[in-house]
Amino acid sequence: MSEVFTHINEEGRARMVDVSEKDNTIRQAIASGKISMEKDTLERIKEGTISKGDVLAVAQVGGIMGAKSTSQIIPMCHNILISNCDINFKFDFENSEIEIVAMTKTVGKTGIEMEALTAVSAAALTIYDMCKAIDREMVISDIMLVKKSGGKSGDFERVGL
């Protein structure tokens, strides 16, 4: 791993990295996160009885919109073409939580990790927003990059998950 901060110039000021000379390559990233909640809230999401509607359907759209908006909310992110974004949810009744997994893909000059992380974050925030009227104890946690492939820096896969 490089110890050079690529988003800082010689004067110590923030900058966007110039990727114009880089090759287009297939790049993919997977990120995950969790939102824990009261057991009744989890049951109501699964049963589809939340008054605002189908929580996971809306969260899926929110996650995709988040991925598409990454360059507008993360200052030094490039605006890249996202060729695929898929959001999945896994119910964990034992721990009273939903795991959110986002996969993003592009063919481009820079990575797509931030889009995957933003997709998970936006999906979790959407779940929170749709359920906050009945559960203010929800906690969003463990948002992380799980895997990435493609690009000059090589592949990464988190171990121990």
UniProtKB/Swiss-Prot annotation:
UniProt-listed Enzyme Commission number(s): 4.6.1.17
Active-site residue list: D129
Biological pathway: Cofactor biosynthesis; molybdopterin biosynthesis
Alphabetical keyword list: Lyase, Molybdenum cofactor biosynthesis
Entry GO MF terms: cyclic pyranopterin monophosphate synthase activity
Top-tier EC class: lyase
Organism annotation: Clostridium acetobutylicum (strain ATCC 824 / DSM 792 / JCM 1419 / IAM 19013 / LMG 5710 / NBRC 13948 / NRRL B-527 / VKM B-1787 / 2291 / W)
Binding positions for substrate per the UniProt entry: M76, C77, H78, M114, E115
Listed InterPro entries: MoaC (IPR023045), MoaC_bact/euk (IPR047594), MoaC_sf (IPR036522), MoCo_biosynth_MoaA/MoaC (IPR050105), Mopterin_CF_biosynth-C_dom (IPR002820)
GO terms under biological process: Mo-molybdopterin cofactor biosynthetic process
One Pfam entry name: MoaC
Record protein name field: Cyclic pyranopterin monophosphate synthase
